[in-house]
């Protein structure tokens, strides 16, 4: 839930007036601003509520990072069976859209099970497996293998480009004896395959040590190991939107199998007031669907967060063109009027001395929509200027 929806509290006098209070982050208010609306199940029309900003004096509290609101509206009908719904609408339209051709936006999953073994020739054999991305794509991948000594940087690593294979050999003549090496591999659609897109992320690394001098291979290879390391996703050309409010850098990548992963960036402070959703159509005539769940990752040193969602792909050969859009979702809350009554305070309170030296307190009560609903009163009184000595009495009518 957003902060406005989480903080929303609404009550009514069960006669004509509805009052709501809520808050939003002050920076989100300055950038965007939200409008509270109300609807019931009889009229079924959203009606904006009249809202007034509350001051620190109104709240009797110190300033904080939020803007507090009190909103009011009048209604003619209350009762069990009359349902009230409340929601927030941003004062600006927030959305971004993209047409996606699956076969032109491929990013394979990283190769798995990378391993190294010593051949009888003394060369080293690297092998790996591809993750199922569909038979067509699986036969159309090319691979990049990079390897280096452990202490060297990847920028200076040796690189091999290999079309449609899941192994390669490294000649012992090209390796320094008695050195520790590390290798990794990634995949991309082959240039002549009819697919296009981007490299996968790198596989996990594999490490080994070359024999040195008279050292036997069996001893030198003891303890070669696999280790995991995360590598940055290669840069992709962004779809940018004007202004700092709109979702930006919307992009979608197809694994070649059964998933289309879309991601976008939004200002973090705006997400305190608005929840963004990803919506898609597999064909122009199909009904729009919402992708779920949406994941979020914070970016360091930037006011933006990355949100993402995976769209299931059932038949990429017959449905390869998708339209996706990111926009603010509609949040609504059902608040039952008869369970959230706050009666208007009694009017014309007066005190009368009785003949037996007692005092009688009287007032005019606030009428509810239904006369059979009883009201319970709390009377509070004290000696003049002695508020700490308070006495309560409770009475029903």
Name each model-derived stretch.
Residues 1-26, 94-137, 197-268, 331-370:
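Pro/Thr/Ser/Gly-rich low-complexity, intrinsically disordered linker/stalk tracts
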Residues 6, 25-47, 131-151, 248, ...:
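Solvent-exposed loop/turn segments flanking beta-strands in beta-repeat/beta-sandwich domains
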Residues 22, 88, 111, 126-128, ...:
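An aromatic-rich alpha-helical recognition segment common to small helix-rich domains
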């Amino acid at each position: 839930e957003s902060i406005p929806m989480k903080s929303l509290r609404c009550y009514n006098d069960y006669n004509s007036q509805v009052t709501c209070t809520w808050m939003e982050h002050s920076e989100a208010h300055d950038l965007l601003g939200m409008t509270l609306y109300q609807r019931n199940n009889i009229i079924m029309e959203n009606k904006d509520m009249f809202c007034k900003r509350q001051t620190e004096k109104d709240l009797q509290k110190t300033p904080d990072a939020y803007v507090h609101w009190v909103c009011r509206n009048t209604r003619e009908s209350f009762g069990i069976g009359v349902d009230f719904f409340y929601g927030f609408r941003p004062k600006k339209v927030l959305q971004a859209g993209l047409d996606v051709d699956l076969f032109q936006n491929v990013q394979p999953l990283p190769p798995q099970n990378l391993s190294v073994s010593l051949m009888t020739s003394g060369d080293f054999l690297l092998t790996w497996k591809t993750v199922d991305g569909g038979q067509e794509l699986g036969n159309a991948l090319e691979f990049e293998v990079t390897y280096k000594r452990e202490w060297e940087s990847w920028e200076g690593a040796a690189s091999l480009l290999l079309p449609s294979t899941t192994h390669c050999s490294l000649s012992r003549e090209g390796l320094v004896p008695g050195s520790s090496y590390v290798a990794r591999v990634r995949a991309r659609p082959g240039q002549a395959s009819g697919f296009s897109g981007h490299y996968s992320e790198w596989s996990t690394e594999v490490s080994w040590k070359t024999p040195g001098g008279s050292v036997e291979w069996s001893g030198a290879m003891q303890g070669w190991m696999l280790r995991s390391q995360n590598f940055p996703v290669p840069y992709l050309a962004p779809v940018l939107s004007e202004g700092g409010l709109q979702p930006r850098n919307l992009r979608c990548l197809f694994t070649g199998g059964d998933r289309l992963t879309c991601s976008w960036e939004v200002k973090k402070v705006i997400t305190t007031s608005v929840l963004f959703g990803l919506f898609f159509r597999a064909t122009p005539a199909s009904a729009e669907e919402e992708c779920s769940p949406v994941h979020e990752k914070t970016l360091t040193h930037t006011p933006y967060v990355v949100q993402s969602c995976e769209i299931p792909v059932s038949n990429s050969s017959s449905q390869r063109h998708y339209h996706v859009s990111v926009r603010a979702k509609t949040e609504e809350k059902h608040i039952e009027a008869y369970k959230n009554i706050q009666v208007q305070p009694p009017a014309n309170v007066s005190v009368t001395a009785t003949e037996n030296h007692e005092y009688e307190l009287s007032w005019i009560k606030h009428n509810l929509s239904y006369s059979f609903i009883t009201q319970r009163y709390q009377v509070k009184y004290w000696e003049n200027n002695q508020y700490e000595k308070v006495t309560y009495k409770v009475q029903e009518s």
